[in-house]
């Protein structure tokens, strides 16, 4: 398996399985001198970890991260940062019945066909449990970006099923279990989840992630465009089936006179492009949206086959999220932070001394 790393200069490599002994990652390329403690990383991990609300999986993992290397006397040294989280609440017996069956909608069949074997305990490496390490690594990037450049990266749940938000209040997001910025929609989300639990079913969701304060100039055309790397990172999140930058697929219905973002001496008058032009950050907010599918781990019976190809039926047991989009909020933040951090380091290495006569708007 070769696809365990992301980034070029700020590079994150993860390892571990859902029911293994531990999860871990190596973060390369973090500049030296950043004050960093385990508590700094724990904040976002606590936002992602399972068992924290009645709306998500009841698997209870402390997700306490340990810094193994790369930090000395409270500051990063510039060497590889090693991070580790031990798994403590595995219930592998929940998966014994699917040892020889493929869960429809999951990676069971494709992993088996590609590798000739699979870890059926919670999906092994394909499980979203792996994203805990992305969040830990992303927290390193988020702290550096905010402390050194004033860049802030935040996300929120913008839609669950047919319930969409009408407004965004950044101060409201941490006041509810849904990371919802619209207080008027919390009860509707609550009602939807309760209904799904009774039915044993699940629902999809849409997450919006925003990077504020990103300077103009990040992105490496033509193949490492900033929007291309953002899409790559967000698409790599478990259950994500679609990514939009700015207005995304709405541009199909727009005219050029509507979509273009006029420039004025005071700044851009709109942001349909989502803060990226020609693959390079424009200085506006970077705005992206991800669509997450409804999880297939449900108690509604579904058709599948056994390892020998025989027809059978499957009811998924275990502890699962009725909507995986809820806990995907800090994951989306982490992935965007990793990409912005990587491009910032790359830009500084090549274009540090570039100056133009045109004022930055």
Swiss-Prot record:
EC primary class: lyase
Database matches in Gene3D superfamilies: Chorismate synthase AroC
Gene Ontology molecular function: any one: FMN binding
Residues bound to FMN: 125-127, 238-239, 278, 293-297, 319
Cofactors demanded by this protein: FMNH2
Subunit structure, interactors included: Homotetramer.
UniProtKB keywords: Amino-acid biosynthesis, Aromatic amino acid biosynthesis, FAD, Flavoprotein, FMN, Lyase, NADP
Function noted in UniProt: This reaction introduces a second double bond into the aromatic ring system.
Family assignment from sequence similarity: Belongs to the chorismate synthase family.
NCBIfam families: aroC (TIGR00033), PRK05382.1 (NF003793)
Binding note for cofactor: Reduced FMN (FMNH(2)).
Gene responsible for this protein: aroC
Lineage: Bacteria, Pseudomonadati, Pseudomonadota, Gammaproteobacteria, Vibrionales
Entry-linked Pfam families: Chorismate_synt
Catalytic activity: 5-O-(1-carboxyvinyl)-3-phosphoshikimate = chorismate + phosphate
EC number(s) stated in the UniProt entry for this protein: 4.2.3.5
Protein name listed in UniProt: Chorismate synthase
GO BP: amino acid biosynthetic process; aromatic amino acid family biosynthetic process; chorismate biosynthetic process
Gene Ontology CC annotations of this record: cytosol
Pathway: Metabolic intermediate biosynthesis; chorismate biosynthesis; chorismate from D-erythrose 4-phosphate and phosphoenolpyruvate: step 7/7
Residue sites binding NADP(+) per the record: 48
């Amino acid at each position: 398996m070769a696809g365990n790393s992301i980034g070029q200069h700020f590079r994150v490599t993860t390892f571990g399985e859902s029911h293994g002994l531990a999860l871990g990652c190596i973060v390369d390329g973090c500049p030296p001198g950043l004050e960093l403690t385990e508590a700094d990383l724990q904040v976002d991990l606590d936002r992602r970890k399972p068992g924290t609300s009645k709306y998500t999986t009841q698997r209870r993992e402390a997700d306490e991260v340990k810094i193994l290397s790369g930090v000395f006397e409270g500051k990063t040294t510039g060497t590889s940062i090693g991070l580790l989280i031990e798994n403590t609440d595995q219930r592998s017996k929940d998966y014994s019945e699917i040892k020889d069956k493929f869960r429809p909608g999951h990676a069971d069949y494709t992993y088996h066909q590609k590798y000739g074997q699979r870890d059926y305990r919670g999906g092994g490496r394909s499980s979203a449990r792996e994203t805990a390490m992305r969040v830990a690594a992303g927290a390193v990037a988020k702290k550096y970006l905010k402390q050194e450049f004033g860049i802030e990266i935040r996300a929120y749940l913008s839609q669950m099923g047919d319930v969409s938000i009408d407004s965004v209040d950044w101060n409201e997001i941490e006041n509810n279990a849904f990371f919802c910025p619209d207080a008027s929609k919390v009860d509707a989300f609550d009602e939807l989840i309760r209904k799904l639990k009774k039915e044993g079913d699940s629902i999809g969701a849409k997450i919006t992630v925003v990077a504020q304060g990103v300077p103009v100039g990040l992105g490496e055309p033509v193949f490492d465009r900033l929007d291309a790397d953002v899409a790559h990172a967000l698409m790599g999140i478990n259950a994500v089936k679609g990514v939009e930058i700015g207005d995304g697929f709405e541009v199909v219905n727009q005219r050029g006179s509507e979509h273009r973002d006029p420039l004025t001496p005071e700044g851009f008058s709109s942001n349909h492009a989502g803060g990226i032009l020609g693959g390079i950050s424009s200085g506006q907010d970077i705005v992206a949206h991800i669509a997450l599918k409804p999880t297939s781990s449900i108690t509604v019976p579904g058709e599948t086959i056994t390892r020998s190809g025989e027809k059978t039926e499957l009811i998924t047991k275990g502890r699962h999220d009725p909507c995986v989009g809820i806990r995907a909020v800090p994951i989306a933040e982490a992935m965007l932070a990793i990409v912005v951090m990587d491009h910032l380091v790359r830009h500084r290495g090549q274009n540090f001394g570039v100056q133009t006569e045109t004022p930055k708007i």
